[in-house]
Design a protein with these regions (language model features):
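Loop-helix junctions at membrane interfaces
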Residues: 1-176
Length: 176
């Protein structure tokens, strides 16, 4: 990971963070116990370019900015932790690595299992004072997981393969 920030890195991260906010908060579908968005697409690009830690930090910044500008519920720090961990997962699977079907599936599966099926139900149970075994929490989550896992895997592969990383690396003044 390149620890030194430069103008290119800051501007690219800012652009990707803005896209995450728009895809998550404006174009995303959100109900009380479920959220569907395509904010993972700019996270993939950020992960490929900047690695796990910077992607996690960018996801946290996007979450906080999105919450400040387009709050749909009370702020809960657990979801910000989800954003950081999700960004780190993308960075782990895609930083300086070729995007394959296997990586796309494993990354999506890891995010689905850890974020959607472990952490988010805990946060929802805490926020809404529901038992962790409640179908109010698990019903929509299982349906979303079953529907979004293949969609997200396919889009992750397509986006990951479409990004001309070698061109981006040549144009930048630092190595990714």
């Amino acid at each position: 990971m390149n620890k030194k920030l430069n103008a290119y890195m800051i501007s690219m991260m800012g652009l990707l963070i803005a896209i995450m906010v728009v895809l998550s908060r404006i174009l995303g579908l959100e109900w009380q116990f479920i959220k569907i968005s395509f904010a993972f697409v700019p996270k993939i690009v950020m992960a490929m370019m900047f690695g796990p830690i910077w992607t996690g930090i960018g996801a946290v910044i996007a979450d906080i900015i999105g919450m400040m500008l387009f709050a749909k519920a009370a702020f809960f720090p657990g979801f910000t932790l989800n954003a950081f961990i999700g960004g780190c997962i993308y960075g782990y699977f895609f930083y300086k690595k070729e995007v394959t079907w296997k990586n796309a599936f494993l990354c999506t599966l890891a995010n689905t299992l850890l974020i959607s099926f472990i952490l988010t139900p805990i946060w929802l149970a805490i926020m809404y004072n529901q038992p962790l075994t409640s179908w109010v929490i698990w019903g929509p989550r299982l349906v979303k997981g079953a529907l979004m896992l293949p969609i997200q895997t396919i889009l992750t592969y397509i986006v990951g393969r479409a990004i001309p990383m070698k061109t981006l690396m040549k144009r930048s003044r630092y190595s990714f």
